[in-house]
Amino acid sequence: MTAEYSRLQASRDEQTPWKKWGPYLSERQWGTVREDYSENGDAWNFFTHDHARSRAYRWGEDGLAGISDDQQQLCFALALWNGNDPILKERLFGLTNSEGNHGEDVKEYYFYLDSTPTHSYMKYLYKYPQAAFPYADLVATNRRRSRNEMEYELLDTGVFQDDRYFDIFVEYAKAGPEDILIRITAANRGPDAAELHLLPTLWFRNDWSSWIAESNRATQKPNLKQMKTPTGTSAVAAAHTVLGDFTLWCEGETPLLFTENETNHERLFSGQKNESPYVKDGINDCVVHGNEDAVNPGKQGTKVAAHYQVNVGAGETTVIRLRLSNASSVADPTPFGKPFDDMFADRLREADEFYKSVTPPSVSEDAANVMRQALAGMLWSKQFFFFDGDNWLDEHNSNPLHSGYHSSRNSEWYHMLNKDIISMPDKWEYPWYAAWDLAFHTLPLAIVDPDFAKEQMQLMLKGVYLHPSGQLPAYEWNFSDVNPPVHAWATLFLHRTAQALGGETDVEFLKLAFNKLMLNFTWWVNRKDRFGKNVFEGGFLGLDNIGVFDRSAPLPTGGHLEQADGTAWMALFTQNMLELAVELAAHDPVYEEMVYKFAEHFYFIAAAMNKAGPDGMWDEEDGFYYDLLRLPDGSATRLKVRSMVGLLPLCAATVIEQWQRDLAPRATAGLYKRLGRMPELRNSMHPVGSGHLGVADRGMFALVNPERLRRILTKLLDENEFLGPYGIRSISKFHEQHPYIFHVNGQEYRVDYLPAESNTGMFGGNSNWRGPVWMPVNAMIIRALLNFYVYYGDNFKVECPTGSGKLMNLFEVSKEISDRLTRIFLRDEHGRRPVYGGTEKFQSDPQWQNYIQFHEYFHGDNGAGLGASHQTGWTGLVAKFIQLYGFLDAKRALEGGKLSAFHKKSPANRLSQPETLLDIGKTSAVHKEGGVRTHA
């Protein structure tokens, strides 16, 4: 058992608070919906980056390489000044949605290099230019560029010329749950000595001011003050009535600059007076402008920075050390010295041991580095998220529980009280949770911290998140938007993970999740199956601009869309709920009724989706699924865009083991009778039941039959259509030469193959589903292929790539797709990483080339990273791909069973993980098309 696993176990079993402190500080609190109190809902311009240094936040804090406690009462982060910038570098800079030619975009270079799941060791790198940061140039140049042009990046400005920058490494090591050692290393990569101001900063989140709602307001204002210390150190005493007393020790007799975390009204709002003589930007004004009156000579406040001023020689480094501890943790009056550095060495060694225990030994050194950085990114992307719907809506005069309210954004979500640590998609570009993203986050998180992954799923199903109607909240810009229903699938995966780790079935977790997911399923059926036909709408369903029309808006034609992806997601939802019901039926036979209910509902969805003729989504001529435009007169038109929408029906595929049928015998018998009475159900999906079982009597629930599976795979595996060098494209390359065009009332609606960024402003313009490669839907395709493989075995083979003459079984196809996805991040034969495209600095400079960014999506033809640069939310799935195919081969998949295919290592390393992807722990079946074995 590794030392880190022991800490995880203590955190779970003994409630030792190893996770109380972590990287829970956002990287952008400004420009968020929570901080928006404008009349028009313009969050980006109501609270800007320029305001952020001077204006206290209401709902959270942000900072550079920062940490906080799990209620974000006390925060620590690093501020920097190079002597040339007009402001301190206290937070990352980026463009707002209207400033960027492809929407909002961070314009900095930073990397999450390492983290253990308890944050006993963490490492972060920020690259800080020595010349003045080109704020104005970045804004002006990007504003001039069209959506058809490349983005203007920080490297393009020339500010890193001659390597005139500092590498700033920030490391944390925990000597105990609330004893945090901090080491900051600044390396001058340039040819000349350069000045650098390092300002490690400690502050309290403002929860005491009069403008904080009374129910969230602290009873007593906390305080920071300078302590008397032995020679050679400086220290700050932090007193908080809830958190307790803490000390920040600073190596060296460095000056301490105190101010208040209060708004500078006089700077921002003409005619308003400051409530305090010392305000949030006081330290900035003291250091940058030399205004010593801006900081408190009484050496106390609610925000403090230790001011280290150094001159770093060319190629040299400087190190500063700090220690943040609760008052009882460090009795030794000399908190630094050799034990300090020894603790860092121990924690790094333990981190190495931990990652070795979860990384397959067959994985290359480069792939292991990618996997570790992906998981570090997942762990660094945790954030404290605070939103009190009742109070927030009161403050906007839009709480429907009160008279005189007016409708506003999220006014129907007044029940919400979110105050938790949540895995973010990207802590700068998307510093708010997204429900369907979060389901995918749990897969890589479960590699390192299954407990935290399970907690994330439980959060979204709590009554203070889940709407009373059963709807899951989407994201703060519009909680009422509709995302794919993937939470039952993630719950099933986490359950199987826990079983594989040797734990007992958590029946309470399964029951709670199942009952809440039933509410969500009912919401879908009641709200998104408009006419009760088992054909679903849903809106944009997370795929932004993939459709001919904006799928969240009324159609220009009138009528409505019958969505192939919405219906496919619901088919998968029924399969997941069926499997969860089987698990529960083993402990409570009442749930066997739910097995029947969800299997039957799947049959009805399959029959509706696979309806023959012009009113069906399946196009027999093309061999593909399309959305149906249902016009007001009842007629239907297929929208023949070859997109991920038409591939998703493939993903509704689940193998059913013999033992699962044995756990629900009455349901199984009843379903066979139902199919006997209604043969049209049997004929509308993959064959099931007697005469259609595979190896070990396994069955298959799938929307597509063998013939349709082959036809879809022909397109999916065609390199001139969906199969790109680096994964499955979101739209077929066919549309590069053959755009889809639809005319309505003299208006042209057009879909082209766009392998890079979007050329429209639809959904903010900062994402694109018309060609690039996206990890989550690729993961669902891989899951489906593995399910089909463990049903068919080696008797079902296809050409891969299409037209190559090379036949592969479906395990080999799944691995081929995974390998292509993983190659985005790996060095090729020329030492270049496709993720960095033509950015030569990242490709050839040894100080850049091994630091990985995990982008939101990837160029459909060359694999270059696009969109958000740190979306080790769902792009962290690459860690799961590396781990999965490092452990799993086709033989093991065929010989194992649904649970035995979850890999367990020796008892010495109990933090071993399932070797399967998603919930696919299925074994194979030997099923010959047209000649399967028959079982009674």
Locate predicted features:
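Active-site-proximal polar cores
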Residues: S68
